[in-house]
Amino acid sequence: DHAKKLGIEVMGFEGTEEKSNFDPIITPIKAKNPDLIYFGGIYDQAASFFKQAREKGIKSKFMGPDGMDSSDLTKIAGAAVKGMYYTSVAGPVTVYPKAKKFAQDYKAKFKKDPEPFAAQAYDSAALGLAAIEQALKAAGGKLPSREQVSVAVRKTKYSGLTTNIEFDEKGDPKKALYFVLQVASEDPAKWGENKEVKRLEIAAPPLKK
């Protein structure tokens, strides 16, 4: 219903557990000739599907969820997925101005660009350590309990590489970032150069009483 309100015509749904031969679903999709094909799966299955779809002459744009967010997608599908769209709660490290030095240090140490969620993992660890420090202080220097650390995490406000993090009473981030991204190159080594198409800042849903 919401798609219709946005002027989007959903031409059909196809489901499969196939991982190698997608002809049974590619044929009817090609006949309908949609503007866009959304694949709700993960990169290894999607890569084979997208590659076969292009080989069968399908010209539609491709899109998928955060299960696409892996350089292995281009390693498997190559040029077939260049220009496709995917959504993720994590953008490439290049979209975060404060993460520039982190990216440089990461590449210097590991000889490659940071993988998806690397900057988020850094922020998570740093926030956790800050919360543990606060829990230690609140416990008078004694070893805090798991519950005390959990409470401290929810109270911690942290200015991270990726965003400013603050939690609500449920433990959810008060605001979450959501990205629409586009694959920039068929080269897996350039996955970190994927383009940010749109960024959404979404508030956490209210606590139901």
What positions do the PLM features span?
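Extracytosolic ligand-binding ectodomains
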Residues: 1-209
